[in-house]
Amino acid sequence: MAIERTLSIIKPDGVEKGIIGKIIGRFEEKGLKPVAIRLTQLSKAEAEGFYAVHKARPFFGDLVKFMTSGPVVLMVLEGENAVARNREIMGATDPKKADAGTIRKDFATDIEKNTVHGSDSVENAKIEVSYFFPEVQVHAYEWKKLA
């Protein structure tokens, strides 16, 4: 299996609920390790640039407003098939359609406040990771198994 990197964002609703540690724990329990992590407040320009692919969509303005409404946690996750695994752990975009035990089913409010973002393809993961993290800020390391 391929070792990949993917971008994960804990959105403002996840930060506000105080579940950052729970979310990171779920990724780690499923074999995805954070190799870069940062708590930040996105500017309007950063959010518009990151979500530019949705600019023509009717929800774009609300998405930018929400993503700049409070702090977010930006992470690069690394592991086998990280992109697909991350999406599986997050669950469906609409929490009402998400499987039990996924982050969105357990913590999200609605399709807008759905707690987390994850890259949707290996190609987009590379673009998204580089948008927020220059390579120098990403640190590879090996996990040591606890006895």
UniProtKB/Swiss-Prot annotation:
CDD domains: NDPk_I
An annotated Gene Ontology molecular function: metal ion binding
SUPFAM superfamilies: Nucleoside diphosphate kinase, NDK
InterPro entries: NDK-like_dom (IPR034907), NDK-like_dom_sf (IPR036850), Nucleoside_diP_kinase (IPR001564), Nucleoside_diP_kinase_AS (IPR023005)
Cofactor(s) of this protein: Mg(2+)
Active site positions: H117 (pros-phosphohistidine intermediate)
Pfam families: NDK
Location(s) in or outside the cell: Cytoplasm
One GO CC term, this protein: cytoplasm
Binding, ATP: K11, F59, R87, T93, R104, N114
GO biological process: CTP biosynthetic process; GTP biosynthetic process; UTP biosynthetic process
Record field: catalytic activity: a 2'-deoxyribonucleoside 5'-diphosphate + ATP = a 2'-deoxyribonucleoside 5'-triphosphate + ADP; a ribonucleoside 5'-diphosphate + ATP = a ribonucleoside 5'-triphosphate + ADP
Lineage top rank: taxon: Bacteria
Enzyme Commission code: 2.7.4.6
EC top class named in words: transferase
Stated family: Belongs to the NDK family.
Job description of the protein: Major role in the synthesis of nucleoside triphosphates other than ATP. The ATP gamma phosphate is transferred to the NDP beta phosphate via a ping-pong mechanism, using a phosphorylated active-site intermediate.
Assembly mode: Homotetramer.
Listed name of the protein: Nucleoside diphosphate kinase
Organism listed in the record: Anaeromyxobacter dehalogenans (strain 2CP-1 / ATCC BAA-258)
